[in-house]
Amino acid sequence: MAADSEPESEVFEITDFTTASEWERFISKVEEVLNDWKLIGNSLGKPLEKGIFTSGTWEEKSDEISFADFKFSVTHHYLVQESTDKEGKDELLEDVVPQSMQDLLGMNNDFPPRAHCLVRWYGLREFVVIAPAAHSDAVLSESKCNLLLSSVSIALGNTGCQVPLFVQIHHKWRRMYVGECQGPGVRTDFEMVHLRKVPNQYTHLSGLLDIFKSKIGCPLTPLPPVSIAIRFTYVLQDWQQYFWPQQPPDIDALVGGEVGGLEFGKLPFGACEDPISELHLATTWPHLTEGIIVDNDVYSDLDPIQAPHWSVRVRKAENPQCLLGDFVTEFFKICRRKESTDEILGRSAFEEEGKETADITHALSKLTEPASVPIHKLSVSNMVHTAKKKIRKHRGVEESPLNNDVLNTILLFLFPDAVSEKPLDGTTSTDNNNPPSESEDYNLYNQFKSAPSDSLTYKLALCLCMINFYHGGLKGVAHLWQEFVLEMRFRWENNFLIPGLASGPPDLRCCLLHQKLQMLNCCIERKKARDEGKKTSASDVTNIYPGDAGKAGDQLVPDNLKETDKEKGEVGKSWDSWSDSEEEFFECLSDTEELKGNGQESGKKGGPKEMANLRPEGRLYQHGKLTLLHNGEPLYIPVTQEPAPMTEDLLEEQSEVLAKLGTSAEGAHLRARMQSACLLSDMESFKAANPGCSLEDFVRWYSPRDYIEEEVIDEKGNVVLKGELSARMKIPSNMWVEAWETAKPIPARRQRRLFDDTREAEKVLHYLAIQKPADLARHLLPCVIHAAVLKVKEEESLENISSVKKIIKQIISHSSKVLHFPNPEDKKLEEIIHQITNVEALIARARSLKAKFGTEKCEQEEEKEDLERFVSCLLEQPEVLVTGAGRGHAGRIIHKLFVNAQRAAAMTPPEEELKRMGSPEERRQNSVSDFPPPAGREFILRTTVPRPAPYSKALPQRMYSVLTKEDFRLAGAFSSDTSFF
């Protein structure tokens, strides 16, 4: 054992080459990040173009490192540029000055309007910043600052990185940075001074030059010339006579009825306050040299009028109150309310109305003793007051959220047919001044799933929006909705069509509420046709109709057939006009007995010969070409029932029911039977109109593709046409064959209705009655957004702003995606409303600037165009150069704005009165300067000198300074030769 332990005792020392201290580990992490980002060596880029800092693309990369438990974020900021040729990259000469040092002397991008503060202060295109990761953390002590700066210096030296590396110190709001840039034998130190108050000796150029020269400490005499760039910024806040032109809407006129009801169909537009709060004028002297200009505590040559460059930017008011945005936002807030109409208004007028008519004896007396009401004496103009009277029975007038004048104006706007003393003639009324239906604006409702801009639904949305904002808020909305629902019931009960709705089945491209109103109109049409009791006989129709091309496509399931109502003879009247008013369900017992007596039950088992003995019924007109196959009689087109119109929620319910039947054979069979109700009805009508017909006859008319004819040669050698059913019609247990065997010869007028208008109308009215204001707002919000977009487009067309056109297209694209979903998210809806408000504010800013610059007052067309272009640039660009500086047309207007503001602030007499004053002495005493003291003064001093010794390499030196009322900052970049020092 002793022998074995001897070698172990010889191992007495282990050399540890790992980075031991936290400081060394931190330096290693910095080097690792620089290597990962490939920031090693010198890569010379192209010279910077003028304005590239603002127009170019800036990108950044970030990583996180830590010093012990203190976390730092490392961020690489760089301007995206085209890479230079490889040959240029390979030429990494030892004496080449790093790119960042060369950028210190660049003059093409002084005072960029929008850039990182280090870009503005030092003119760099690329740099790395190390800053505390947490916003609240800060490097405050001098020792920590020096430790970080030493770490940066070592990391740059070890890696050979030539990109400037900065460390943020002190609190973040102070924007204090120190840093370093290293190259082969050269180094630039970035230093900074930040004070609250400007020292008196440094309030002018001469004092700043003294600092710069002393900091450089150049041993040469005379000192090489210093290049100077100066910018003074003047702020205009008092616009004086240029009042904000927006006029608020006249609410009193609306309430008092002085304005027509059409005002309710118009949305307000514009900002309630001036959306332009300040105008900043920057006067710049870009290339000056020391000795040419004087600026000290006694005298200054820096007159803004004489500045060679003027540029302007406008400061926009933060979130200006905009009428259209407020309207839509307030309406959207209703979507989040939970109250029902009953809770808002108290006891429901709908329930009370139901209690009054609930007495069964009263209902029976209506049936046994009907009172005759001449329709022509019933004035339509009275119906706008009916709903109001019903509500007043249960609620005092003084409790109503809406007063009578407002309510009457709205109802007349929604129902313009109420002005007429004649009942409706059965046509749907629409406005004559609507945009053409082919126009892009009119068809926006397809994209937004709202409603046409001339529809009742669209008008209702606008009225509710205005009521919510001006006349009672949520209570007013609930009141108007209650009135609207009662009006719908009144129209249903009295057979008055609802105006402002397109005829035909519900349009599934529109919102659900619009579909419901269209469904109610369909019910009113059917009920009206039935109640009028118009009857026609098939014999009255002459045989002048052309042959029918067929009813269905090549689908097997009847529900999937193409629009059969078009193919079944649109020229004929609908089946409703054939029905008797007494036959509510078309199942009279006498008819059934008659059918049995006539042997119509034989239709199930008997052949065509037995059916041929039946009396034909329900014929519409004779087919022009076809005859029955078995007896050669002419084939007659029957009167058929129209398919039941459906809204999207009913279609969805039907789809769910069919889907629940499953995929089994029994489920599929049951699903096919449910879908074949319309097919069965048409077969029964066909059998009644064509006694002795066969399934082949029906298929030849209903689905010609399923009857295949081919030429064959008969026994005598003649070419004849022989036909047979298609392969799918011969499939065993075919639904068409089953339906044909089940179908009885019953004309449409005696069939059970496919569409029960009474039941469907009551379902719609119940649906409307139970809608909460929040549900209503959800239904109508697409219409409100649609109206807002149309309003914005209309206002933009007056201003012709290209940037606004692009934003409107984006809003339409975004809205069409969001609103097509059944229940869009609130956040996405808020985004759309916010975008609309931003566009409204943008148009308001354009109008504000046009008013201030007096574009309409320009007599010369060229000057007017220049001003309009200038205003447009102010809206779209962060800073706009004034052509001709203070001597150009725009410059003179800006000068005048400042002069007027100065005189108003000093309470001096106008210019005309100053001219009348006697001596020049008096005029001088009463006059004020044209411009206020500059709000900010910026100086950039540059030179190239050898440092630290006369024989050192001449390197770039730069100092940026900014002086404001409460801020004084110096940012210096001082380079030195490190070859022998």
From Swiss-Prot:
Residues 592-613, 908-937 are annotated as: Disordered. The modification Phosphoserine is found at S83, S379, S537, S579, S581, S590, S664. One of its GO terms (biological process) is regulation of GTPase activity. One of its GO terms (molecular function) is GTPase activator activity. Residues 912-925 have a biased composition (Basic and acidic residues). GO terms for cellular component: cis-Golgi network; cytosol; endoplasmic reticulum membrane; endoplasmic reticulum tubular network; extracellular exosome; Golgi apparatus; lipid droplet; postsynapse. InterPro entries: Rab3GAP1, Rab3GAP1_C, Rab3GAP1_conserved. Keywords: Cataract, Cytoplasm, Disease variant, Endoplasmic reticulum, Golgi apparatus, GTPase activation, Intellectual disability, Phosphoprotein. The modification Phosphothreonine is found at T908. Ubiquitous. It holds the Pfam family Rab3-GAP_cat_C. It is found in: Cytoplasm; Endoplasmic reticulum; Golgi apparatus, cis-Golgi network. The keyword Cytoplasm applies. Its main location: cytoplasm. The Rab3 GTPase-activating complex is a heterodimer composed of RAB3GAP1 and RAB3GAP2. The Rab3 GTPase-activating complex interacts with DMXL2. Interacts with LMAN1. Catalytic subunit of the Rab3 GTPase-activating (Rab3GAP) complex composed of RAB3GAP1 and RAB3GAP2, which has GTPase-activating protein (GAP) activity towards various Rab3 subfamily members (RAB3A, RAB3B, RAB3C and RAB3D), RAB5A and RAB43, and guanine nucleotide exchange factor (GEF) activity towards RAB18. As part of the Rab3GAP complex, acts as a GAP for Rab3 proteins by converting active RAB3-GTP to the inactive form RAB3-GDP. Rab3 proteins are involved in regulated exocytosis of neurotransmitters and hormones. Belongs to the Rab3-GAP catalytic subunit family. It is linked to Warburg micro syndrome 1: A rare, autosomal recessive syndrome characterized by microcephaly, microphthalmia, microcornia, congenital cataracts, optic atrophy, cortical dysplasia, in particular corpus callosum hypoplasia, severe intellectual disability, spastic diplegia, and hypogonadism. This is Rab3 GTPase-activating protein catalytic subunit. It comes from Homo sapiens. The gene is RAB3GAP1.
